[in-house]
């Protein structure tokens, strides 16, 4: 490999883009040193060449310089080897061959006479004349500005003078000219006085001035300046008590307001803060703690365990600051820090493998931050988004710079920062942000209206980003290092055309550019040198490293006195290479030596190299950051491992052996534990030896050039390059196949053996398609299906031999059978509005063409592709337009229009017509033209326009093409055809009719049988769901992700892997193992000669079914999918609309709303002639709710673009889907030998999000009665109970309950744990509950309405010996225990005053009974700590305050009655108790009388009451059952409506959602309160599911109960051991953690706010005919149809062993009645028929009930929930004859002709008669003749099997008869309504 790259003088245009390439001249101010009479070969010419070589070496220090030299009127290339230690006289000038083709742009021209033409490739030439005269520098402005040209000339003059008469080394020449010195004096910034101070003083001052103004707005809360100052002072006092003054205190925290509190506290305590990154390995963090000899560390609770070390105290900081309150009084008030004290210790990469600590003083940071704030225009209005890690020094500038000006610091969470940066910036209304360019590239300025200023640093910024952002806001480029306190250069206010490489000027003195190898020499302006920084804001140095400090912080060189007469103490060497522009600004060039930055992270290559060598044991290693030839930055490790070493003469790169692979695997596992991820090499390159320089150092230049000459794919392949196989005997046929495969895969033929798999070798579907014609040219008859079925060489060879021996003949295209286009030309011409003679041919459309036309008719503009061709001045426009005309003439599909022929369906007419060129002023105008005159039936489907410039000259050629005549595969083919025509090459005719012929010959019966079998019993779930029936998706948003694949070789294609992974994602998100999604095939596998080069729409969309089998091996599942895809190939052209008509199952399968498209890499090359105009045009190509377009960029990268409808999917949710897809793809690549069920879709992003949603939860240390007693003591006279039978104050509640507790203790003759309470609703219930607690017992509320046997069973289970009862129920109590305590008889009487026991918080508080599967109720046990922890969370969430008056409505058998009492008392509120008659007969009056303002109710109860009757009620929380949308609409405008969820086993309430609106999803049960909510596999709770997946909810945390009393087996089943995955989310001991399996199916809300959607019970999924039903949705539509006097329930029932959807309807009753079934009278039938008709017009057929049962009243359970079991029993008790009377209408199949009993069969007028006949014509054809009598005029078109294609056909036919409606009207209106839209 030739590594010589020539020499290119750098572009010095001062950051400006200049096109001028004319020659300009600047004269040199130096005379010829000697006479030129000795000619151009003389000594002077040699000296001039040497001077020129030194100049080139000065500006681009490259050891080998090359330039052109004129000799004998010919330009030759000369080169010279340069070395700084070399004497200039020893430089050897070597003359090479011609300079043509060499990469040189400078030259030396010494001519005899006259001017000599200078080649345009030479941009800088030294010109002299042998005949005498001076020298001049000829330059082109596109290389040098005039100022820089003068600088170069002055430098050359200085060099030439230095050579006169002296023998000096190159390095000793001072090349700094007088002009340069003048410029540097001008550039130097005058010193100015800067403020000195301490950082913590900033906050103290602002706290006084701005007090309650918000200082920090964080994801975890807000802090005012006063709060920030107070909290940090409080913590500082505690830190002083630990004697930390003068020490380093590491801080380990994620983004949080508390991190800033901790920083300030450390500073106020007189210590120095040392931020650590918690994402780094534990070993690295602990080594930093040891290096700084820390006595204490501060961490958030989540990361405290990372820093647990002997002798180091861990201080946990967070919202709970109570631990610090105990230390407010420090031993003595220590003085605050001095401005010369150390403030921060920041860690950066070190060269030895260990990190290095940079010491920053208060004053350095204070000055730097003050200047930073001023330069970025910070003010009190600034809302600064804190993006960078706390370990970056610039984070200090953001934090303290913002706070110093009184602004607001906006703090996102780690998850927001990494996964939803746009959302975080928008939510926090940030006005300023410091970002890396990588992060900026992911944002769109249009999405961030509040953002006014962005500063970019850390890595280079592209021109594209500058252009995108500079027009919208103030864009600044910053530069700085940790050693310079975060920054030292700013380039503010970039223009859209500004140069992002320009770092700007210093605002604090000063910066200098010295020679990288000799800082005692400054470099000329424009030359590359090392940046030196001086000033008061420099760091002290490096922690405990005097040697490194001395090397980087140097004393001022001697040249400093020329520019700084005052004292400069030291400078910092940055190791960064830069150059001056002529205006004094500095431009970045690169990193010096071994330091680099990658993705904004600063790295030390020696550190990484040291770690790699350590991990690789005996291997030699060199690590370099290289940029590949395809411009990909890769951290690359070059390795020589044991067993691969060889002599230096051997090829440098060698094939990897087993030892190399094992070494790399082991190294990666070690590096991932010891280095941050960005410091782990991306690729390892196997070498035979390390190349060396002359000084025996690793020749890194050679290694970099070696890697930079390769692409990313080339480097990656080096790790897995297949080894040559042993030469095995091959048959002649196998040898042919071997050659074909070698040609396609670029793998040497000798490396391909008979057992090799085509797909192992990199084959894919595209290469398989290209293999077919290649094989045909070699005489082999092959199909794409053959390649997939027989992927191994020997298998394919055997198959072809068998085919040949049997004389098999492949089918070829046949003419379209029995179709004469002649009769239809006139009809086609009429529909097209053209002359019949212009019609060349008419033939049928493919199913794809039909479907695309139908879909675009529903959504104007859909499936239209816009393309553009740039017209450069060099293009001959006339010739180009003629080329296009030639192609259109040769390719009939480009002249095709689509029409509909009566009784024959859709056909395509080829029209003999020329291109009609339009002229437009903008692309938007062209789009508007196409919108006003859409591409549709009868119109041109390919349109052309010329875009005119401001001068009315054509600047672009525009095309609009309908996808019914064009597909993606055709794009490069069309480009090639136009290019051929433009170059005068012939364009071969192409006939799409051949493909149509092939499709028409496929036997329809066989095709339909295939799809019927393929989709039999299909049970798919539509994803994403549509917001309403008949909704037409409009994908207007997109999201993108790159998937990086692990290196692997598998036997299947990338497409197959993506399909399996997408199926897994869909399965998780739908909760269905039977998945169907849309898949797109190229259609290029058809047996049509030349199909691979045919321009036309051959692609096909099919329903792709995947049945997930968790027990199958991944490799087997992949192979099965690939086999399915191969089997499907002959049947893929049937068309979705036709497949849907085959059966009910196929129709359901074709109802998918997500489409997967995989574009395999195409090796045919690309052209710049045609390109997609913009992303919006891509959005117009799709009509599904979600389309996933995946493009395989190379063997280890896939670009995934998701196009989606924002009304169906949230943008953040789509990103979750893409993350999970990427995670699944990586897993099946990395571990293909696992089982499908072992693949986890829980992505790292999911894990981070779940961690954030489930933070640590505090556990209460108090009992419930202790908490209530605090309220009693705080508010003794406040009303605690307001009851129908009297009122009780908190003092009375406390005293009465204590007295009663003593009596309980006295009466308990034997130990008892449980005390049942048998009371009617009364004020005494509260007293008894509290008394039982104080007595150390657990209460059990009994419902007195229960049968005595049930009550006896409960008491028996609990071994109860004492019952507290009221007088009313004394008789029943006597039957339960022998000696009950009658409360109202003894309350207030003198009694014993016994010492009450001390109750532990873990003691049982109460037991509540739930129904059990065995018929025996289960007693759930809840402790004080469990309920108290839950109450501390749900009380503030539900807004329960001392002013809250809670209605006590729930039955005592329902645990809601407990929350009504206890949580109210704990908050200091009042419980309002109604009597039973008030509760049932006069609820509104009683609530008003007691002024109740809060209620916990079930949704069923709210359906019986009117919000207007409850004016005092301002808060309502619904719980206990699923909420309907109707409840939200009725109540949300009247009260603060909330929804809660919680099983009895989890302290009543586990989730709560406040403040519902009419836009709220009724399924959303809110976020976890006092617990963690996890979604697990319903069949395996040890498997945590990804975000968005449907799974079982398990609850973990302190609210989880103790289990079931006396039922260990049931307890074990419901409260299982803690799953292993929980340890990933807990830092502490898990022995006390409990989890509860709810049995409820949920999924996280797509809004990704941590809330949950309730799906249903695990054991009763509601599905009917393969469709999941939301019963509440059907109920919602039914309620909206009926007046308010009705009650209804929709339920799935089973009758005659068949499931059916039933609607139970009842009139509202004033008083309870027994529930029973009523007869179906004519009146009932009339009501229900009207209701059914309305539902049928709004809902899909499967959601319309078929069984309609009138009943007396909707039954309720004792807990006031709808009793659905009773309804199912009512239906089940019906006889077969009775059941038939309640079937209002039979369900409709997809087959046309089925009628409903209520349908009107006789049209009323002529319009209806005509329309009825037109409908009949639409259904005449392959489905047979449809009876007119079976076409209902008051029914929907879809009722008789109509679909979108039929709607388009009807629209076309009806238009000819005067009807004016759209395809959308047909799908959404009744036929009678359509008939009225006729204009006669």
UniProtKB/Swiss-Prot annotation:
Region (Adenylation 1): 205-594
Pfam families: AMP-binding, Condensation, PP-binding
Pathway the protein acts in: Mycotoxin biosynthesis
Residues covered by the Carrier domain: 728-804
GO molecular function ontology, one term from the record: phosphopantetheine binding
UniProt EC number: 6.3.2.-
Protein's GO biological process: amino acid activation for nonribosomal peptide biosynthetic process; ochratoxin A biosynthetic process; secondary metabolic process
Keyword Membrane: no
SMART domains (UniProt xref): PKS_PP, PKS_PP_betabranch
Database matches in InterPro entries: AA_adenyl_dom (IPR010071), ACP-like_sf (IPR036736), AMP-bd_C_sf (IPR045851), AMP-binding_CS (IPR020845), AMP-dep_synth/lig_dom (IPR000873), ANL_N_sf (IPR042099), CAT-like_dom_sf (IPR023213), Condensatn (IPR001242)
PROSITE patterns tied to this protein: AMP_BINDING, CARRIER, PHOSPHOPANTETHEINE
Residue numbers bearing the O-(pantetheine 4'-phosphoryl)serine modification: 765
Residue numbers spanned by region Condensation: 840-1250
EC class name: ligase
Domain of life (superkingdom): Eukaryota
Catalyzed reactions: 7-carboxymellein + L-phenylalanine + ATP = ochratoxin B + ADP + phosphate + H(+)
Family, per entry: Belongs to the NRP synthetase family.
Protein name per the record: Nonribosomal peptide synthetase otaB
């Amino acid at each position: 490999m030739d590594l010589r790259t020539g020499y290119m003088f750098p572009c010095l245009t001062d950051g400006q883009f200049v096109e001028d390439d004319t020659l300009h001249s600047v004269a040199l101010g130096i005379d010829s040193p000697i006479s030129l009479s000795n000619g151009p070969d003389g000594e002077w010419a040699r000296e001039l060449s040497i001077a020129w070589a030194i100049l080139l070496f000065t500006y681009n220090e490259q050891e080998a310089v090359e330039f052109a030299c004129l000799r004998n009127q010919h330009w030759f290339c000369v080169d010279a080897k340069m070395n700084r230690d070399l004497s200039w006289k020893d430089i050897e000038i070597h003359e090479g061959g011609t300079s043509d083709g060499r990469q040189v742009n400078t030259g030396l021209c010494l001519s005899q006479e006259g001017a000599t033409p200078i080649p345009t490739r030479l941009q800088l030439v030294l010109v002299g004349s042998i005949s005498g005269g001076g020298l001049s520098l000829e330059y082109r402005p596109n290389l040098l500005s005039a100022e820089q040209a003068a600088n170069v000339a002055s430098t050359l003059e200085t060099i030439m003078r230095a050579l006169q008469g002296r023998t000096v080394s190159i390095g000793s020449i001072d090349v700094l000219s007088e002009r340069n010195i003048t410029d540097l004096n001008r550039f130097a910034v005058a010193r100015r006085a800067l403020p000195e101070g301490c950082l913590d003083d900033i906050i103290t001052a602002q706290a006084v001035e701005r007090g309650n103004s918000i200082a920090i707005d964080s994801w975890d809360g807000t802090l005012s300046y006063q709060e920030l100052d107070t909290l940090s002072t409080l913590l500082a006092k505690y830190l002083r008590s630990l004697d930390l003054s003068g020490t380093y205190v590491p801080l380990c925290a994620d983004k949080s307001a508390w991190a800033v509190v901790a920083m300030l506290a450390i500073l106020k305590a007189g210590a120095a803060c040392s931020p650590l990154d918690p994402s780094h390995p534990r070993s690295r963090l602990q080594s930093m703690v040891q290096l700084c000899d820390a006595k204490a560390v501060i961490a958030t609770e989540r990361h405290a365990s990372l820093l647990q070390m002997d002798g180091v105290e861990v201080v946990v900081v967070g919202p709970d600051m109570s631990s610090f309150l105990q230390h407010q009084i420090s031993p003595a008030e220590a003085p605050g820090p001095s401005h010369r004290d150390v403030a921060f210790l920041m860690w950066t990469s070190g060269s030895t493998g260990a990190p290095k600590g940079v010491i920053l003083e208060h004053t350095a940071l204070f000055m730097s931050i003050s200047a930073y704030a001023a330069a970025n225009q910070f003010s009190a209005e600034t809302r600064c988004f804190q993006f960078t890690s706390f370990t970056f020094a610039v984070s200090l500038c953001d934090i303290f710079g913002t706070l110093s000006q009184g602004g607001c610091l906006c703090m996102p969470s780690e998850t927001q920062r990494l996964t939803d940066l746009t959302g975080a910036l928008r939510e926090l209304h940030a006005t300023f942000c410091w970002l890396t360019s990588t992060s900026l590239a992911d944002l769109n300025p249009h999405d961030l209206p509040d953002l006014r200023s962005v500063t970019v640093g850390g890595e280079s910024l592209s021109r594209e980003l500058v252009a995108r952002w500079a027009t919208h806001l103030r864009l600044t480029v910053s530069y700085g290092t940790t050693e310079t306190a975060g920054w030292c250069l700013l380039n503010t206010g970039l223009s859209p055309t500004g140069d992002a490489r320009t770092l700007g000027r210093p605002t604090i003195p000063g910066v200098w550019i010295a020679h990288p190898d000799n800082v005692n020499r400054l470099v000329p302006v424009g030359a590359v040198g090392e940046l030196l920084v001086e000033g008061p804001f420099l760091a002290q140095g490096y922690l405990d490293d005097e040697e490194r400090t001395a090397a980087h912080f140097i004393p001022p060189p001697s040249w400093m006195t020329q520019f700084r007469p005052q004292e400069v103490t030291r400078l910092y060497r940055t190791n960064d290479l830069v150059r001056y522009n002529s205006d004094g600004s500095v431009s970045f060039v690169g990193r010096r030596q071994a330091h680099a930055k990658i993705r904004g992270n600063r790295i030390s290559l020696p550190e990484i190299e040291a770690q790699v060598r350590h991990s690789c044991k005996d291997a030699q290693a060199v690590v370099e950051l290289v940029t590949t030839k395809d411009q990909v930055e890769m951290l690359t490790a070059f390795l020589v491992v044991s067993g691969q070493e060889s002599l230096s003469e051997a090829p440098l790169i060698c094939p990897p052996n087993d030892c190399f692979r094992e070494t790399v695997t082991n190294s990666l596992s070690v590096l991932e534990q010891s280095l941050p991820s960005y410091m782990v090499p991306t690729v390892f390159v196997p070498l035979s030896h390390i190349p060396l320089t002359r000084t025996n150092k690793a020749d890194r230049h050679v290694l970099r050039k070696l890697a930079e000459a390769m692409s990313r794919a080339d480097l990656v392949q080096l790790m897995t390059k297949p080894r040559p196989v042993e030469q095995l005997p091959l048959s002649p046929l196998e040898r042919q196949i071997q050659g074909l495969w070698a040609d396609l895969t670029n793998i040497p033929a000798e490396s391909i053996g008979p057992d090799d798999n085509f797909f192992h070798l990199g084959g894919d579907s595209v290469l398989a398609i290209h293999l077919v014609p290649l094989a045909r040219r070699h005489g082999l008859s092959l199909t794409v299906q053959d390649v997939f079925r027989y992927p191994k060489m020997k298998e394919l060879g055997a198959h072809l031999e068998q085919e040949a021996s049997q004389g098999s003949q492949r089918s070829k295209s046949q003419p379209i059978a029995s179709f004469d286009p002649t009769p239809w030309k006139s009809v086609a011409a009429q529909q097209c509005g053209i002359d019949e003679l212009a019609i060349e041919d008419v033939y049928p459309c493919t199913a794809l063409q039909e479907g695309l036309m139908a879909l675009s008719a529903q959504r104007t503009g859909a499936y239209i592709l816009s393309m553009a061709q740039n017209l450069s001045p060099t293009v001959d426009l006339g010739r180009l337009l003629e080329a296009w005309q030639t192609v259109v003439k040769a390719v009939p599909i480009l002249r095709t229009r689509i029409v509909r022929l009566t009784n024959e369906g859709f056909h395509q007419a080829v029209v003999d017509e020329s291109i009609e060129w339009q002229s437009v002023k903008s692309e938007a105008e062209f789009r508007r033209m196409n919108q006003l005159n859409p591409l549709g039936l009868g119109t041109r489907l390919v349109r052309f326009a010329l875009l005119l410039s401001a001068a009315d000259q054509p600047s672009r050629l525009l095309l609009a093409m309908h996808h019914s005549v064009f597909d993606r595969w055709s794009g490069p083919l069309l480009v090639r055809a136009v290019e051929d025509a433009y170059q005068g090459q012939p364009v071969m005719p192409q006939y799409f009719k051949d493909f149509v012929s092939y499709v028409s010959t496929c036997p329809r019966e066989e095709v339909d049988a295939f799809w019927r079998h393929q989709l039999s019993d299909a049970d798919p779930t539509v994803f994403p769901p549509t917001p309403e029936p008949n909704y037409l998706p409009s994908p207007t948003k997109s999201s993108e992700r790159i998937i990086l694949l692990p290196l692997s070789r598998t036997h299947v294609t990338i497409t197959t892997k993506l399909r399996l992974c997408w199926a897994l994602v869909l399965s998780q998100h739908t909760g269905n193992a039977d998945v169907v999604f849309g898949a797109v095939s190229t259609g290029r596998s058809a047996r049509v000669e030349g199909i691979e080069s045919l321009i036309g729409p051959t692609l096909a969309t099919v329903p792709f079914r995947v049945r997930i089998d968790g027990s199958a091996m991944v490799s087997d599942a992949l192979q099965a999918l690939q086999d399915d895809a191969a089997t499907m190939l002959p049947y893929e052209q049937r068309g979705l609309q036709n497949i849907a008509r085959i059966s009910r199952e196929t129709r359901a399968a074709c109802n998918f709303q997500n489409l997967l498209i995989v574009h395999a890499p195409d090796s045919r090359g690309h052209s710049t002639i045609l390109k997609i105009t913009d992303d919006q045009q891509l959005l117009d190509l799709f009509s599904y709710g979600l389309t996933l377009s995946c493009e395989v960029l190379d063997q280890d990268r896939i670009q995934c673009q998701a196009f989606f409808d924002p009304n169906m999917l949230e943008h953040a949710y789509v990103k979750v889907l893409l993350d999970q897809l990427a995670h699944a793809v990586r897993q099946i690549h990395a571990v293909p030998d696992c089982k499908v069920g072992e693949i986890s879709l829980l992505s790292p992003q999911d894990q981070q999000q779940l961690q954030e949603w489930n933070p640590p939860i505090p556990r209460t240390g108090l009992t419930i009665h202790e908490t209530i007693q605090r309220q009693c003591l705080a508010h003794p006279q406040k009303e605690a109970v307001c009851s129908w039978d009297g009122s009780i104050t908190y003092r009375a509640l406390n005293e009465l309950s204590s007295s009663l507790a003593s009596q309980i203790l006295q009466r308990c003759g034997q130990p008892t744990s449980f005390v049942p309470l048998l009371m009617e609703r009364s004020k005494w219930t509260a007293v008894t509950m509290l008394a039982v607690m104080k007595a150390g017992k657990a209460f059990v509320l009994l419902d007195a309405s229960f049968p005595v046997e049930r009550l006896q069973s409960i008491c028996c289970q609990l071994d109860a010996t004492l019952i507290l009862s009221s007088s009313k129920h004394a008789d029943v109590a006597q039957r339960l225990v022998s000696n009950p305590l009658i409360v109202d008889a003894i309350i207030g009487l003198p009694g014993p005053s016994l010492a009450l026991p001390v109750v532990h918080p873990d003691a049982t508080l109460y037991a509540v009974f739930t129904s059990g599967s065995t018929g025996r109720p289960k007693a759930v046990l809840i402790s004080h700590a469990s309920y108290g922890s839950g109450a501390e969370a749900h009380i503030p969430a539900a807004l329960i305050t001392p002013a809250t008056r809670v209605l006590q409505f729930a039955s005592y058998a329902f645990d809601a009655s407990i929350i009504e009492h206890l949580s109210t008392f704990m908050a200091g509120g009042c419980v309002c108790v109604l009597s039973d008659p008030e509760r049932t007969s006069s609820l509104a009056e009683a609530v008003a009388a007691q002024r109740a303002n809060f209620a916990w109710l079930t949704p069923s109860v709210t359906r019986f009451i009117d919000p207007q009757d409850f004016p005092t009620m301002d808060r309502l929380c619904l719980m206990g059952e699923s909420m309907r949308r109707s409840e939200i609409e009725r109540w949300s405008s009247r009260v603060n409506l909330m929804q809660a969820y919680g099983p009895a086993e989890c302290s009543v309430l586990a989730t709560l959602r406040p403040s519902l609106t009419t836009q709220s999803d009724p399924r959303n049960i809110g976020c976890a309160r006092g617990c963690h909510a996890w979604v697990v596999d319903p069949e395996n709770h040890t498997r945590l599911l990804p975000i968005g997946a449907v799974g079982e909810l398990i609850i973990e945390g302190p609210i989880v109960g103790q289990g079931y009393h006396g039922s260990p087996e049931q307890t074990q089943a419901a409260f299982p051991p803690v799953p292993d995955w929980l340890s990933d989310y807990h830092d502490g001991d898990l022995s006390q953690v409990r989890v509860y399996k709810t049995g409820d199916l949920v999924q996280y809300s797509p809004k990704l706010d941590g809330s949950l959607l309730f799906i249903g019970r695990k054991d009763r999924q509601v599905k009917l005919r393969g469709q999941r039903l939301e019963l509440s949705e059907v109920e919602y539509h039914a309620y909206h149809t009926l007046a308010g006097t009705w009650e209804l329930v929709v339920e799935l029932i089973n009758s005659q062993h068949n499931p059916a959807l039933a609607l139970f309807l009842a009139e509202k009753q004033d008083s309870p009645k027994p529930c029973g079934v009523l007869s179906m009278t004519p009146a009932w039938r009339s009501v229900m028929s009207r209701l059914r008709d309305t539902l049928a017009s709004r809902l899909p057929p499967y959601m319309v009930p078929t069984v309609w049962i009138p009943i007396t009243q909707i039954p309720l359970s004792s807990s006031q929930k709808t009793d659905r079991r009773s309804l199912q029993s009512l239906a089940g008790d019906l006889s077969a004859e009775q059941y038939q009377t309640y079937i209002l209408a039979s369900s409709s199949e997809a087959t046309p002709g089925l009628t409903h009993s209520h349908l009107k069969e006789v049209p009323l007028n002529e319009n209806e008669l005509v329309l009825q006949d037109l409908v009949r014509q639409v259904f005449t054809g392959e489905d047979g003749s449809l009876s007119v009598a079976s076409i209902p005029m008051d029914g929907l078109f879809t009722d008789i099997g109509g679909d979108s294609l039929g709607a388009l056909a009807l629209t076309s036919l009806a238009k000819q008869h005067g009807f004016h409606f759209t395809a959308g009207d047909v799908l959404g209106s009744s036929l009678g309504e359509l008939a009225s839209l006729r204009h006669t």
